[in-house]
Regions:
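S-adenosyl-L-methionine/SAH cofactor-binding core of RNA-modifying enzymes
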Residues: 4-70
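C-terminal folded domains that constitute the principal catalytic or ligand-binding module
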Residues: 54, 63-155
Length: 155
């Protein structure tokens, strides 16, 4: 994502509860902050997309993202952006039985489309597609077909 947008900050870790920079951003901009994180049902505490100026994204596997969220108690009170309409993932090398199980990049892209409708996110989508093509190329067509291509792999 940092290849496509210049107003992005990346922090690495598992527990951001005491992370000074993140806490300063949350405290100074609370009415304009949202967390991109799945919820089971729409919550009562919502934020209009146009009000969001800071979007916090947890990037990792589902298990890792859950752990980061669980440990980072400073994120628990933030309003969340979740998707309740059915969205099909384009991540062809990932299989998940969960509804709306988008990659972090896909979910961020969808969130940005809601937050900033005039923002051109095509570069992000193209980068994502190239990354997938590269990974398929490296694993080989046979492995891709066997493990991920449901149309061909089920023959």
């Amino acid at each position: 994502m940092s290849l496509c947008f210049n107003n992005i900050q990346i922090f690495t870790g598992e527990n951001f509860s005491l992370h000074q920079e993140i806490n300063d951003e949350i405290n100074n901009n609370f009415s304009h902050v949202a967390l991109l994180y799945p919820e089971q049902s729409p919550s009562a505490f919502k934020r209009e997309p146009s009000d969001i100026r800071l979007l916090i994204v947890i990037d990792g596997t589902w298990k890792k993202a859950f752990k980061i969220y669980s440990l980072s108690v400073n994120l628990h009170s933030l309003p969340k952006i979740s998707f309740f309409d059915k969205i099909k993932s384009s991540y062809r090398i990932r299989s998940s039985s969960k509804t709306n199980s988008l990659s972090s990049l896909e979910a961020t892209n969808k969130a940005l489309e809601k937050i900033e409708p005039d923002l051109d996110t095509k570069a992000l989508t193209k980068l994502f597609e190239k990354m997938i093509d590269f990974q398929i190329e490296k694993m080989g067509e046979e492995i891709f077909t066997k493990n991920y291509d449901k149309k061909k792999g089920s023959d």
